[in-house]
Swiss-Prot record:
Pfam families: Ribosomal_L2 (PF00181), Ribosomal_L2_C (PF03947). It comes from the Bacteria. It comes from Rhodococcus opacus (strain B4). Residues 37-58, 268-278 have a biased composition (Basic residues). GO terms for biological process: cytoplasmic translation. GO terms for cellular component: large ribosomal subunit. GO terms for molecular function: rRNA binding; structural constituent of ribosome; transferase activity. Keywords: Ribonucleoprotein, Ribosomal protein, RNA-binding, rRNA-binding. Residues 1-58, 225-278 are annotated as: Disordered. The gene is rplB. This is Large ribosomal subunit protein uL2. Part of the 50S ribosomal subunit. Forms a bridge to the 30S subunit in the 70S ribosome. The lineage of its organism: Bacteria, Bacillati, Actinomycetota, Actinomycetes, Mycobacteriales.
Length: 278
């Protein structure tokens, strides 16, 4: 993938850039692997906003991605097409299996049209192949990794992301995550070889608010610039600080609140945060 920069012919074009989509080999998805996708606009079943700044955007269809691949062990496949997926930053690859079935997978870097792909314990260590962690050599770069055996890929699925297999001991493998976190995962969990393609995605300059609206992202307005009727921080003469600790529009204190997960005990070293990121 390469990035094409626009000339500053208009204020919206100034500084903006776009992917050249050179790796895309087909513009229409496989019909049998597409499902309708209805936008919720950040609302729940009661019609109340539960996630702000969502809504609108271009109409999309959902592509069914095979995140497990455990029922195709030993069945060879070929990459028929590399396609665009509006629902994720990574590209997707359409596989044609020898038994006649078609499936989508996340397209890793280096995968091309016509490339052979396989899954199973005996698969070669090549981009796109899927194996259990116990069969992958230490030091290998992997993506689309499961957290629980048979649970489907959960980690390193976005464009340019990858995980490094640091070692294996007993029934656990040690992984270095994209965030820098080091954690242990069951060696029966499966992973795909290589790093996810389309790594230049993070360097795209969107240029104008309208392109964000096409993606279904709405404006984020600060509470201090609202009226008192709209937000607890609103109102006041001139510029004010809000006059209280940060709260949501509904008066609840702002800040991350997360419960500990059962899998947290498998974390060896936490990801770098705050000043430690540098």
């Amino acid at each position: 993938m390469a990035i094409r920069k626009y000339k500053p012919t208009t204020p919206g074009r100034r500084g903006s850039s776009v992917s050249d989509f050179a790796e895309i080999t087909r513009s229409t998805p496989e019909k049998s692997l597409v499902r309708p996708l209805h936008g919720r606009g950040g609302r729940n079943a009661h019609g109340r906003i539960t996630t702000r700044h969502k809504g609108g955007g271009h109409k999309r269809a959902y592509r069914l991605i095979d995140f497990r691949r455990n029922d195709k062990d030993g069945v060879p496949a070929k990459v028929a097409h590399i396609e665009y997926d509006p629902n994720r930053t990574a590209r997707i690859a359409l596989l044609h299996y020898a038994d006649g079935e078609k499936r989508y997978i996340i397209a890793p870097k280096g995968l091309f049209q016509g490339a052979p792909v396989e899954s199973g314990a005996g698969a070669d260590i090549k981009p796109g192949n899927n194996l259990p962690l116990r069969n992958i050599p230490t030091g290998t770069t992997i993506h689309a990794v499961e957290l629980r055996p048979g649970g489907g890929a959960k980690m390193a699925r976005s464009a340019g992301s990858s995980i490094q297999l640091l070692g294996k001991e007993g029934t656990y493998a040690t992984l270095r995550m994209p965030s820098g976190e080091i954690r242990r995962v069951d060696v029966r969990c499966r992973a795909s070889i290589g790093e996810v393609g389309n790594a230049e995605q993070s360097n795209i300059n969107w240029g104008k608010a309208g392109r964000m609206r096409w993606k279904g992202k709405r404006p984020t307005v600060r509470g201090v610039v609202m009226n008192p009727v709209d937000h607890p921080h609103g109102g006041g003469e001139g510029k004010t600080s809000g006059g209280r600790h940060p709260v949501s529009p509904w008066g609840k204190p702002e800040g991350r609140t997360r419960k500990n997960k059962a899998s947290d005990k498998l974390i060896v070293r936490r990801r770098r945060t705050g000043k430690n990121k540098r």
